[in-house]
Design a protein with these regions (language model features):
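C-terminal scaffold of the Radical SAM
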Residues: 1-201
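Short amphipathic alpha-helical interaction segments
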Residues: 200-214
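A short, conserved structural fragment
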Residues: 214-224
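Minor-groove-contacting beta-hairpin "wing" of winged helix-turn-helix DNA-binding domains
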Residues: 225-230
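Short, amphipathic alpha-helical interaction segments positioned at domain boundaries
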Residues: 231-246
Length: 246
């Protein structure tokens, strides 16, 4: 994958964290890797669980633009294989005391990541450091996303120019889609009052899409609470597209 560290260095970092007194730490682990089988994916996940992290981010590889894999796509597992890996991995994590609270986030009891929960609930956050991203909501209803300069050397050498590389103010008609892109990843979904408070929009505008998606059994609604069904979680991209303008 082109990572700059080895597995031995990863294990060493875990030991250093424990020796430093941290009783809570997270491990990131990808699946759906080139030529990966169900057995090798389970082996990787077993190895991560054996390290006893309090939180585990287990997510599928995605091919991003401007990467080596995007220029030269590798042979990846097919959809059925990915589904088997996902199902088996979720069961393995549950059997070892890890509860899923977001599409790719699992934790032991009491160790949900507060930053993750805020982020996926469409909360605001500050991006600090090279390449960091942030989101700020303003009293007048504007919502801005920004990112800092990506390269550490460039970031640290900036004197007369701002550290922020770019900012973007969300258009009003895309805010609902942006909210859904985050909140529907959470197992518990969101409440309609939460949608209103985080976006500044009237949740009544969601009614046509919510009714349609509930009829298709992709979403489930319990009074003011909305979340994706098991099937819906497999088709989040299609669900989210319903809330963006054509």
């Amino acid at each position: 994958l082109g990572r700059i560290h080895t597995s031995d260095q990863a294990y060493a970092a875990i030991d250093f964290a424990r020796q430093a007194g941290f009783d809570s730490f997270n491990l990131d682990l990808m699946h759906g890797l080139p030529a990966q089988t169900l057995l090798s994916a389970k082996t990787d996940l077993f190895a991560a669980i054996a390290c006893k992290p309090s939180h585990l981010s287990w997510y599928q590889l995605t091919i991003e633009p401007n990467t080596v894999f995007h220029k030269r796509p590798p042979l990846l597992p097919v959809e059925d294989e990915l589904a088997d890996i996902q199902q088996c991995g979720e069961q393995l994590l549950a059997d070892n005391g890890y509860s899923q609270y977001e599409v790719s986030a699992y934790s032991q009891e009491g160790f949900n990541c507060r930053h993750n929960s805020n982020y996926w609930s469409f909360g605001d956050y500050l991006g600090i450091g090279a390449g960091a991203h942030g989101k700020i909501s303003f009293p007048d209803g504007r919502i801005k996303r920004y990112n800092k300069r990506r390269q550490p050397q460039e970031y640290m050498s900036v004197t007369s120019q701002p550290f922020v590389a770019s900012t973007r103010t969300l258009h009003r008609d895309e805010i609902a889609g942006e909210f859904m892109m985050n909140a529907l990843r959470l197992n518990d979904g969101f409440t309609l009052p939460q949608f209103a408070s985080r976006t500044g929009l009237d949740y009544a505008q969601l009614e046509p899409q919510l009714e349609l998606l509930c009829q298709r059994e992709l979403l489930v609604r319990d009074r003011n609470a909305v979340r994706a069904t098991g099937t819906g979680r497999r088709f989040l991209d299609s669900i989210i597209a319903e809330f963006f303008p054509d």
